[in-house]
């Protein structure tokens, strides 16, 4: 597994300029915690990606914001709301965003910020009579 994670990280950097880091499991057994100290200050380069401790990795994280070509993620904790957001966006975007189902059965919507990387933020919204958390994960954070 570690070799394939290293290769996936290398490919993502070469093809998309996304800086990926190795992750270890958290207390819930999910690979979400960066192995490397100082991952927020890593220089985005192929040499950096290849030098990380992938042999210890139990998962792969993507560093968001300026380190990864202004990549950001909308983390939606409700499937119905995520679908509504996607339908709204598909009518207004030039390309379809990438969707990823998370380890906790939530949805990540990946997109590239156009002007500059934003800080992360979190909102509780009402949707279909219930409260739902929607989080913009952006500059200085990572997603698994």
Residue ranges and their predicted role:
Residues 1-144:
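Conserved phosphate/metal-binding and DNA-contacting active-site motifs used
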């Amino acid at each position: 597994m570690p070799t394939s994670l290293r290769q996936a990280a290398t490919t993502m950097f070469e093809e998309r300029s996304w800086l990926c880091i190795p992750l270890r499991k958290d207390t819930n057994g999910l690979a979400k915690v960066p192995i490397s100290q100082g991952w927020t200050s890593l220089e985005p380069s192929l040499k950096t990606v290849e030098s990380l401790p992938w042999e210890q990795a139990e998962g792969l994280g993507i560093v968001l914001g300026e380190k990864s070509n202004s990549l950001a993620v909308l983390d939606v904790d409700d499937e119905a709301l995520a679908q509504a957001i996607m339908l709204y966006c598909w009518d207004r975007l030039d390309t379809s965003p990438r969707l990823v189902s998370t380890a906790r059965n939530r949805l990540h919507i990946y997109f590239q910020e156009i002007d500059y990387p934003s800080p992360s933020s979190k909102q509780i919204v009402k949707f279909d009579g219930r409260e739902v958390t929607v989080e913009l994960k952006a500059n200085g954070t990572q997603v698994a």
